[in-house]
């Protein structure tokens, strides 16, 4: 994969052929971006649980958007049931370059346009600040068992303003 920084990312819907590249992107993101918050064993269990059998089908069942640079995926977000941000990953080389913000803003606009009134997410420790900056509030802390490991995450929510009420990202 080339360095994604020289070009602005494009945005497109998930295609079934994306599953392999997005699985690799997940693994790289977990390994490099979550190292400060999760042990190596926790990262491995987390990664294995995400890219298990059915990963492509899971993405296809959701509204999944893919950010690309020069045709290569650099991030993706999956919105389930027009309400829950199910999966959201950015490649480490694209982190901090606005890819995550672009993906999130697009999915929030789509959810609102489709009548969504609330977004929820179970957010990893390293992504909590990203969601707080976008108006999400923490509801509860969770401990999730994955294989022989436990992972901590936080359930967060954000009410969406109606499209005709001047809604938008704060």
Regions found by a protein language model. Name each.
Residues 13-19, 24-93, 104-106, 110, ...:
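Acetyl-CoA-dependent GNAT
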Residues 117, 121-128, 134, 140-170:
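C-terminal "cap" of GNAT-fold acetyltransferases
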Residues 62, 135-136:
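Short glycine-aromatic motifs
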Residues 1-20, 162-170:
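Conserved N-terminal entry element of GNAT/NAT acetyltransferase domains
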Residues 7-10, 83-86, 152:
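Short amphipathic alpha-helical segments
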């Amino acid at each position: 994969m080339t360095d994604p920084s020289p070009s602005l990312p494009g945005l497109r819907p998930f295609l079934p052929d994306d599953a392999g590249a997005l699985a690799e992107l997940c693994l790289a993101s977990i390994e490099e971006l979550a190292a400060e918050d999760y042990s190596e064993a926790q990262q491995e269990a987390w990664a294995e649980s995400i890219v298990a059998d059915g990963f492509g089908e899971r993405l296809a069942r959701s509204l999944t958007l893919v950010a690309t640079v020069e045709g290569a995926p650099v991030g993706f977000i999956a919105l389930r049931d027009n309400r829950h941000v199910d999966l959201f990953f950015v490649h480490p080389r694209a982190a901090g370059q606005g890819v995550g913000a672009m993906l999130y803003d697009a999915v929030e606009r789509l959810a609102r346009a489709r009548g969504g009134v609330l977004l929820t997410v179970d957010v990893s420790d390293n992504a909590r600040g990203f969601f707080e900056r976008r108006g999400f509030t923490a509801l509860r802390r969770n401990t999730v068992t994955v294989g022989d490991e436990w992972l901590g995450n936080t359930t967060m929510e954000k009410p969406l303003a109606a499209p005709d009420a001047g809604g938008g990202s704060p």
